[in-house]
Swiss-Prot record:
HAMAP family: His_tRNA_synth. This is Histidine--tRNA ligase. Its EC number is 6.1.1.21. One of its GO terms (biological process) is histidyl-tRNA aminoacylation. InterPro entries: aa-tRNA-synth_II, aa-tRNA-synth_II/BPL/LPL, Anticodon-bd, Anticodon-bd_dom_sf, His-tRNA-ligase, HisRS-like_core, HisRS/HisZ, HisRS_anticodon. The lineage of its organism: Bacteria, Pseudomonadati, Pseudomonadota, Gammaproteobacteria, Alteromonadales. It catalyses: tRNA(His) + L-histidine + ATP = L-histidyl-tRNA(His) + AMP + diphosphate + H(+).
Length: 415
């Protein structure tokens, strides 16, 4: 688990603001779900033999003996909320969410046991147009963040559920001949979830997989047509991609389209965004059959990538520091501060509290990171003036009337 400290928050706020703006530009609405859900929700959706359910979920019994889990991902919760509140049946919904998720896994660079995800979920649209839309939305985010040259889109199709099952059987039959040579995790997965072996990082297992059947050989005609329509739309929109037939995703609910955005900018190749189509999940969780497609983006890795590429320029926490010198100034400081906030709502103004000498207050003003100190004493109060002292430049201090002060401070609100 990790804290986000005050000096880190502005970078996150900058990232969140871009995400909110881009999601809104595609007509998506925010949904907020609880972080605590019934354990059965994730067992039914993610799959009981996945690593997440078997090893990584934070699960416990509440006081009523009900098994509950801190959400490890957002899609299942979003579907549950949509079913529960009647948002999905016979409707088109474009939803987004952002918030903390929890997985008990080994902490590493950009990965924590409490982490944050931004997710997009589209319901009620079966055509490849919807798949293209969510991928285009994610691509726009990379462009907005200035990271388009740091990420690569990898794309695959799992075909229909029947095609996936047929491929699963063929892959299992092939790998059974090499069972003794597989790594321990792959041996365990051979019976329960052989598709996950395609994700193995073991070099010997990867060598064995080179001769494995190809997933595309098992695509049904409709899935093949759907995938061709998707790639045609991406190509028409100028989105380049790499076909990766070993891309299967770690959650059981996917069918047809799956995709990942990967980067090598954080060291070894890592995934920073992943998603796909999950047409059966809504019905699986108690709703009516509803097509759906979406993605999730890991925000810790996104922020880290932006920082390492020098792409974050968060706004200052403080623009101006108001220094009242003397009792009369201290009495009037709250009134003056509120008037400034009324005139300049975007101004980040700290008003000194607790009195003290000019030297002491100036030290605190400098430490705050403010661009200017606003000094008021008895003379300034009497004449309705404010003395402005720049703290980050060699400019001379000046004493200004109210309107001149507002005009002076206005540019700071854009910094």
């Amino acid at each position: 688990m990790n804290d986000l400290l005050p000096e880190q928050s502005p970078a996150w706020q900058q990232v969140e603001a871009v995400i909110r703006r881009v999601a809104a530009s595609y007509g998506y609405s925010e949904i907020r779900m609880p972080v605590l859900e019934s354990t059965q929700l994730f067992k039914r959706s993610i799959g009981e033999v996945t690593d997440i359910v078997e090893k990584e979920m934070y699960t416990f019994d509440d006081r009523n003996g009900e098994s509950v889990t801190l959400r490890p991902e957002g899609t299942a919760s979003c579907v549950r909320a949509g079913n529960q509140h009647g948002l999905l049946y016979n409707q088109i919904q474009r939803l987004w969410y952002m918030g903390p998720m929890f997985r008990y896994e080994r902490p590493q660079k950009g990965r924590y046991r409490q982490f944050h995800q931004f997710g997009i979920e589209t319901f009620g649209l079966e055509s490849a147009d919807a798949d293209a839309e969510v991928i285009l939305l994610s691509a726009r985010l990379w462009r907005e963040f200035g990271l388009a040259d740091q990420v690569e889109l990898q794309l695959n199709s799992l075909g229909s559920n029947e095609a996936r099952a047929n491929y699963r059987d063929a892959l299992k039959a092939y790998l059974s001949d090499y069972e003794s040579e597989l790594d321990d995790d792959s041996k365990r997965r051979l019976e329960s979830n052989p598709l996950r072996i395609l994700d193995s990082k073991d070099e010997k297992t990867q060598k064995i997989l080179e001769g494995a059947p190809s997933l595309s050989e098992y695509w049904d005609a409709e899935s093949k047509e759907h995938f061709e329509q998707l790639t045609a739309r991406l190509e028409a929109a100028g989105i380049s991609y790499t076909l990766n037939e070993r891309l299967v995703r770690g959650l059981d609910y996917y069918n047809r389209t799956v995709f990942e955005w990967v980067t090598t900018a954080l060291g070894a190749q890592g995934t920073v965004c992943a998603g796909g189509r999950y047409d059966g999940l809504v019905e699986q969780l108690g709703g009516k059959a509803t097509p759906a497609v979406g993605f999730a983006m890991g925000m810790e890795r996104l922020v880290l990538l932006l920082q390492e590429q020098g792409k974050l320029t968060p706004r200052r926490v403080v623009d101006a520091y108001l220094m009242p010198l003397g009792e009369e100034a201290e009495l009037n400081a709250p009134r003056i501060a509120e008037q400034l906030r009324n005139e300049l709502p975007e101004l980040r103004l700290v008003s000194h509290c607790g009195g003290g000498s000019m030297k002491k207050q100036m030290k605190k003003a400098d430490k705050s990171g403010a661009q200017v100190a606003l000094i008021i004493g008895a003379d300034e109060i009497a004449q309705q003036l404010v003395t402005v002292k720049p703290l980050r430049t060699a400019e001379e201090q000046q004493t200004l009337g109210w309107q001149a002060l507002i005009e002076f401070l206005q540019p700071l609100t854009r910094g």
